[in-house]
């Protein structure tokens, strides 16, 4: 066991997570069509504060993330402060770590708490796949800049005469890695082939995810942590996530064609997480501050770890790399965990990470560790379903997982929970949570 790194303030206070909330998650171009991420962020933070009844001046910092950023609101965190009635003096800044963005936001607030610069803060993220920054071609962008510099009309007309029809076509946001040109689905396909993960295994995991998420909603387990969203024109509120397929059968998954490798692939739209809109946030504070305010924390942040690996192959193995670090820093092993919640970007990626967490060879030859991190107990794993069912608003997923895991730990009488995710750019994140 390596060095344990306790997450405590200088006064010995633990980092308490006192509350968490999210919007329902909606598939792209459905219930939240036309609602930008900044408005989703305002929606969830405003409701989170209202439900917590914490005075606005208690919150000293807000760290928020958005992966698909809009040029008109580059600092989503500050816009949320200004748009929710929070104290205008609240420090606010934005972060981005791809799919692990709200993990990063939580870590940043925790570090401020440990440094003693604040005693309470909010962390979270929001993304919209329905309101996208549609760009212009590089040639048109250059002409537009030169157009503003030109002094006479003749110069301006000459600039536009250089353009061709193709230069005027809108440019959608990139879906591939900037450094490699590979789509995440391409990497998921590569990992499925490398680690021998079959189409049947992927479909079975996806089906399990939807079944468990549907059951969680049916049992009322998500009611406290998901707000009702009222959206223009205010005719039909969104109460639940609208991606969950509660009535599907395993045979339904087999009907879909591969989405990336059309000839020989196994990754489909059904065993991958969909493009999604939504927001999520949590309130963190020092343990003593929570006691002063008479608040009972949902739980505590025990440890966290971020890792980075190569992007050309196995880019989505973040959980297999970050989990042993987070456990080591918490002074725990896999067997100590009550719950494990892993982000399901793709069923193939999820199954590959599960496989390698239990691999002695991977631990020895790749991680340089003496023993495997540990086998993943299916009875502890994604017990309420995962991102394949709920959806994945990139910057919101981490805060969803943290809130969901803490609530489930409390229902089970406490214990330790691991939340972990892969992210674009070969990044990985893992956090160990504790509930009493």
Curated annotation (Swiss-Prot):
Domain of life (superkingdom): Bacteria
Alphabetical keyword list: Acyltransferase, Cytoplasm, Fatty acid metabolism, Lipid degradation, Lipid metabolism, Transferase
Acyltransferase listed as a keyword: yes
Localization, UniProt: Cytoplasm
PROSITE patterns per UniProt: THIOLASE_1, THIOLASE_2, THIOLASE_3
Enzyme Commission code(s) on record: 2.3.1.16
One annotated Gene Ontology cellular component of this protein: cytosol
Broad class of the protein's primary localization: cytoplasm
CDD domains in UniProt: thiolase
First-tier enzyme category under EC: transferase
GO MF, one annotated term: acetyl-CoA C-acyltransferase activity
InterPro entries registered for this protein in UniProt: Ac-CoA_C-AcTrfase_FadI, Thiolase, Thiolase-like, Thiolase_acyl_enz_int_AS, Thiolase_AS, Thiolase_C, Thiolase_CS, Thiolase_N
Family of the protein in this entry: Belongs to the thiolase-like superfamily. Thiolase family.
Role this protein plays: Catalyzes the final step of fatty acid oxidation in which acetyl-CoA is released and the CoA ester of a fatty acid two carbons shorter is formed.
Protein's name in the database: 3-ketoacyl-CoA thiolase
Organism: Escherichia coli O9:H4 (strain HS)
């Amino acid at each position: 066991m390596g060095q344990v790194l306790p997450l405590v303030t200088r006064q010995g206070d633990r980092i308490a997570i006192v509350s968490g909330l999210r919007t329902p998650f909606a598939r792209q171009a459905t219930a939240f069509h036309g609602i930008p991420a900044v408005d989703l962020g305002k929606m969830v933070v405003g409701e989170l504060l209202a439900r917590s009844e914490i005075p606005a001046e208690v919150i000293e910092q807000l760290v928020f993330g958005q992966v698909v950023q809009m040029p008109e609101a580059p600092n989503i965190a500050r816009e949320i402060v200004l748009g929710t009635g929070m104290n205008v003096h609240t420090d606010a800044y934005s972060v981005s770590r791809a799919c692990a963005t709200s993990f990063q936001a939580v870590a940043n607030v925790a570090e401020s708490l440990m440094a003693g610069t604040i005693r309470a803060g909010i962390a979270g993220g929001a993304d919209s796949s329905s309101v996208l920054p549609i760009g212009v071609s590089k040639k048109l962008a250059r002409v537009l800049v030169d157009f503003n510099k030109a002094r006479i009309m003749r110069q301006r007309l000459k600039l536009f005469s250089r353009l061709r029809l193709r230069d005027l076509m809108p440019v959608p946001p990139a879906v591939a890695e900037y450094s490699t040109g590979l789509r995440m689905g391409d990497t998921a396909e590569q990992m499925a082939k490398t680690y021998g993960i079959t189409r049947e295994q992927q479909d079975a995991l996806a089906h399990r995810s939807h079944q468990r998420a549907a059951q969680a909603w049916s049992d009322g387990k998500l009611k406290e942590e998901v707000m009702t969203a009222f959206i223009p024109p205010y005719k039909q509120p969104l109460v639940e996530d609208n991606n969950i397929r509660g009535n599907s059968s395993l045979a339904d998954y087999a009907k879909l064609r591969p989405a990336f490798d059309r000839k020989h692939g196994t990754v489909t739209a059904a065993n991958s997480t969909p493009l999604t809109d939504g927001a999520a946030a949590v309130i963190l504070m020092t343990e003593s501050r929570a006691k002063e305010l008479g608040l009972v924390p949902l739980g505590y942040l025990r440890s966290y770890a971020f890792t980075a690996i190569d992007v050309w192959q196995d880019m989505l193995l973040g959980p297999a790399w970050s989990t042993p670090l987070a456990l080591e820093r918490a002074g725990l092993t896999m067997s100590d965990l009550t719950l494990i919640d892993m982000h399901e970007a793709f069923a193939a990626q999820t199954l590959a990470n599960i496989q390698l967490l239990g691999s002695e060879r991977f631990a020895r030859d790749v991680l340089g560790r003496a023993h495997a991190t540990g086998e993943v107990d299916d009875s502890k794993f994604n017990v309420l379903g995962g991102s394949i069912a709920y959806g994945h608003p990139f910057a919101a997923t981490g805060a969803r997982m943290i809130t969901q895991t803490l609530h489930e730990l409390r229902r089970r009488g406490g214990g330790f929970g691991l939340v972990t995710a892969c992210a674009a750019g070969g990044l990985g994140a893992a956090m160990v949570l504790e509930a009493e």
